[in-house]
A protein has these predicted regions:
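Active-site diphosphate/adenylate-binding microenvironment
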Residues: 122-210
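Short gly/pro/ser/thr-enriched loop/turn and capping motifs at secondary-structure boundaries
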Residues: 10-15, 48-49, 74-78, 84, ...
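Terminal amphipathic helices with adjacent charged low-complexity linkers/tails
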Residues: 77-120
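Conserved acidic residues
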Residues: 38, 84, 160
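Glycine-rich, anion-gripping cofactor-binding loops and their flanking helix/strand elements
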Residues: 1-68, 180-211, 225-227
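Active-site metal-binding loops of divalent metal-dependent hydrolases
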Residues: 45-46, 218-220
Length: 227
C-alpha cells in the first residue's frame, strides 16, 4: 500500500490507472509524496536530472529520509543521493523476494493509515487532472498542443507504443497521454534531446511485430533526424 512514483522514462512500469500510481505529470504531487516518505525504495533508477537528483526540496533531506536503492549496475548505487542501504540485484528478482517477505509481515502493518494516505493522494490526482484537462476545452486555432497526445490515445488501440520526440512536445505528450500498459513508452528524456523519434518508432515496430506505434514529433525534432 505504498504510493509509487516514477521517473519520466519509467512511466508505465505501474499502470497509471492503478490506485497506488502517482502520475509523473503531476509534478507538485510527486514532490509532496517524495517529501512525505521517511523511507524510499528506489528500484532501477539513478535519480537523474528529471528526478531532481533525489535532492531537497523536491525530496526530503537525506538526514530525514532513508533510502534503499536497488540496481543491477553497481556504479548507479548512491551516485546521486546517499543510499542508506545499497542492493546490487536484478530488479525483478528483488521485488519478487520483497513481495513474499512483506506478505508474511502484513498482519503487523498499519494498513489503514496507509490506505487513508493513498486515498488523499487519489483525491489530489482527480483534482489536478481536472485542472490539466481544462486545456482540452481550448478549441482555438492554432491548436492547443494538449489535443495531440489526447486524440492520439483515443484513436490508437490500447497497448500502442508511444514515441515522443522533441523538448516541449514530449512534455505535452506526457501530460496528456495516460500510461495504462507497461513497456509502451519510448523516448529520450535526458536533457530534452531531439531527433531520435523516427529510429525509436522503427525499433519499436521491429521489437513488437504487429503492434501499432504512435510517434509524436515536434520542436524541430524532425529536422534533426535527417542531419
Amino acid at each position: 500500500h505504498a504510493p509509487v512514483t516514477t521517473s519520466w522514462a519509467g512511466r508505465g512500469v505501474l499502470p497509471e490507472t492503478n490506485a497506488l500510481a502517482i502520475p509523473m505529470a503531476l509534478i507538485k504531487l510527486n514532490n509532496e509524496v517524495r517529501n512525505d516518505a521517511d523511507l524510499v525504495l528506489v528500484v532501477g533508477s539513478r535519480l537523474g536530472e528529471t528526478d531532481w537528483w533525489g535532492k531537497a526540496p523536491n525530496w526530503r533531506h537525506p538526514s530525514e529520509q532513508k533510502m534503499i536503492q536497488v540496481d543491477i549496475d553497481g556504479h548507479i548505487l548512491g551516485a546521486n543521493k546517499p543510499a542508506t542501504l545499497a542492493v546490487l540485484a536484478d530488479a525483478k528478482l528483488f521485488l519478487a523476494a520483497l513481495a513474499t517477505e512483506l506478505e508474511s509481515r502484513k498482519a503487523r502493518m498499519n494498513l489503514d493509515a496507509r490506505q487513508r494516505q493513498v486515498a488523499k493522494y487519489r483525491e489530489t490526482i482527480r483534482s489536478e487532472r481536472a485542472k490539466l484537462d481544462e486545456k482540452l476545452q481550448d478549441m482555438a486555432v492554432p491548436m492547443n498542443p494538449a489535443h495531440v497526445a489526447h486524440v492520439c490515445q483515443q484513436v490508437f488501440p490500447e497497448g500502442t507504443t508511444l514515441v515522443a520526440d522533441g523538448g516541449n512536445t514530449a512534455v505535452w505528450a506526457m501530460f496528456f497521454h495516460e500510461m495504462r500498459v507497461p513497456n509502451t513508452l519510448l523516448s529520450t528524456f535526458k536533457f530534452g534531446m531531439l531527433g531520435a523519434g523516427i529510429a525509436q518508432a522503427l525499433g519499436a515496430a521491429v521489437a513488437r511485430p504487429g503492434k501499432p506505434v504512435c510517434c509524436i514529433i515536434g520542436d524541430g525534432a524532425m529536422g534533426f533526424h535527417p542531419q
